[in-house]
Amino acid sequence: MFDTEDVGVFLGLDVGKTAHHGHGLTPAGKKVLDKQLPNSEPRLRAVFDKLAAKFGTVLVIVDQPASIGALPLTVARDAGCKVAYLPGLAMRRIADLYPGEAKTDAKDAAVIADAARTMAHTLRSLELTDEITAELSVLVGFDQDLAAEATRTSNRIRGLLTQFHPSLERVLGPRLDHQAVTWLLERYGSPAALRKAGRRRLVELVRPKAPRMAQRLIDDIFDALDEQTVVVPGTGTLDIVVPSLASSLTAVHEQRRALEAQINALLEAHPLSPVLTSMPGVGVRTAAVLLVTVGDGTSFPTAAHLASYAGLAPTTKSSGTSIHGEHAPRGGNRQLKRAMFLSAFACMNADPASRTYYDRQRARGKTHTQALLRLARQRISVLFAMLRDGTFYESRMPAGVELAA
């Protein structure tokens, strides 16, 4: 639980682009501030200093710690204030307990301040981020934006191919991440253009970019072209749209590769990098996400707290004798949960202990996704211990399991 014993005033901030609404409450619930605060360092600092001089320790609570909430938090820290974060979902649920249906900045700020005063367990601590982690946070966010853009563009290409030539989509769609395929579509975007270029010429053009796949890829393309003899109306527009989309997809992939190199350079400069990357399934991007979301792990008392934060701890539901059991939680840090889920999937071929744990869960009747989530939960306990002790990963087989000779 967040410690609020020495707090003299709880200052809830409903952050905004140009101004924040501040609402200050004493531990007894007396209102001492309720006004707009311009999003500028001098004005924010003046308010923090004035409250600190009169009431002592000031706890500044925001509902959005990143983006527009970054400046007030930085100024508050520099002014000697404590800082905390009230998650948006918790804030909205708490707001429903207050009378009235109006939603205003003033009401939101009051809810944030009162929640901090009366329900300290709902608050999340905000560690002082070092320069490397702060830079990683920005780069990781940008990389995730690029990944979403790549997915959107790929889906658009696959949608067009499915509409006009489904057989061709079945060949090219799953391979759009390969640079040889995007290079090919940049130059030959329609079935007619591919057929006109000819099998032999396409093999020669693609071979430098995909030496082992070139012949098989072109053979699959022409087999798909032969399957469809009719021309769907509008197919000619593919010569215009698909090359443009393929070019955009290539550019996004190049940006992500360049960004990965920058993330890797920052990661190598962080002391926890060797610890994180020693765990199977944790690469550059996953390690960066772990640093951004977990830090050094000191803000979590136990591995169970970290698992709960990640949304990997089972939620118990019980009501009399008719409803009982444990279910996967819907909340948690989705960014961290996704990173742990994907790393659990990636590690199974590299770590015999993880594979054995997964197979054991499947043998107990768990689905593929359920088994991966359980593996991710087990790995987050290992991750917590690694961060706590500063030790590298050691593969250990579950008790009672022997490896084949």
Curated annotation (Swiss-Prot):
One of its GO terms (molecular function) is DNA binding. It holds the Pfam family DEDD_Tnp_IS110. Keywords: Transposable element. One of its GO terms (biological process) is DNA transposition. This is Insertion element IS110 uncharacterized 43.6 kDa protein.
